[in-house]
Amino acid sequence: MVQKKLMLLGGLRYLLPIIEEAHKLGIYVITADYLPDNIAHKYSDEYCNVSIIDKDAVLKAAQKLGIDGILSHAVDPGVVSAAYVAEKMGLPFQCSYEAACILQDKSRFRQFLRDNGFNCPNAKGYSNVEDALKDVDYFNWPVIVKPVDSAGSKGVTRVDYPKDLPNAIAYALSESHNGHFIIEDFLEKKGFSVGSESFVVDGKLLYNGFYDQYFDKNAVNPYTPSAEVWPSIMEQRYQDEIKSELQRLFTLLGVTTGLFNVECRVCTNGKAYLMEVSPRAGGNRLAEILNYAADVNINEAETRKSVGLSIENMHEPNYKGHFAILVLHSEKEGTFQGVEIESDFKKKHVIEEEIRVSKGGNVGSFTGANAALGTLFLRTENRDEMDSILACINKYVKIILA
């Protein structure tokens, strides 16, 4: 039997579990980006030097290498290229190239939601500042300004007054790949912002790992999650509504099989909104912790899907307690010395520790998910215990800077 080849776009730590799952299945792994020193390349079988946002260059490399599957797992910039290559080569992917382009462009996604009767904030996309400044009366202030093509809350600003719009647009454009940005009404949430790692099989939404997002109000970017907690305490009626709307979205887009990262919220107006839906795993190791927290290995399922292997026994997660990802970060710049974790807390609640920065490395403030220093996986018996820990996390976990 000829060994299957899987191309993974990117080289970050998020790919390591997929490389491990692929190797368990006897799959040959090729990692691809333009940064040969990235950590994932040390664990793959082959490295391909190519820009993952250049879809035609990725296609050319994939055809030359004779791949059987492609993923941009938890790597947002490569999703469109992965969908493009999969469609051109007849490989498995969550959706068509056109559907991926809609989902990956915040402006196009908002328009698609609006055209198809989904709850959607008042929103408009732009490619130049002047057009946006002419539309200040179109919006119900405050507004959110963000790039149409970035993830991890990079380039996102809440703007309360029109006079501050130019600076917010400049920041959004500084984090954009394609030079486009979107402005939309700020939706005041009720309870937590919620996300989900959701898995679809043959067009049917079968798995939803809903989690609640926590934010550090002292961070430079207060819209970047500082923790995620499972299972979500969103009211069941809203979870059911979100699942129903996701299924409707996936049917309209002709989705097939694979993993999606979803962000949603219930607002003070009583409506539930789909905020982001991307055909990839979420960052911050979301799919990884679900393998601790619940009874379905979605990383294995996504790996199997990528090369056309069957997926069995996909179902809603049954949780084994209450779990959290704590995103280690600094509120100021400095030189990294280490992370101090209180010993009893570590013994009782920390199930995995991951540090991405070496001692002596430069540390920046928490401007986005890419500024994370690492993660802690936490477990408690109940939600009240988890909430009390997160409310005073600095008592247990300290970032030491010089």
Residue ranges of predicted features:
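Conserved ATP-binding module of the ATP-grasp superfamily
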Residues: N119-N122, P142-V145, T157-K190, V220-E228, ...
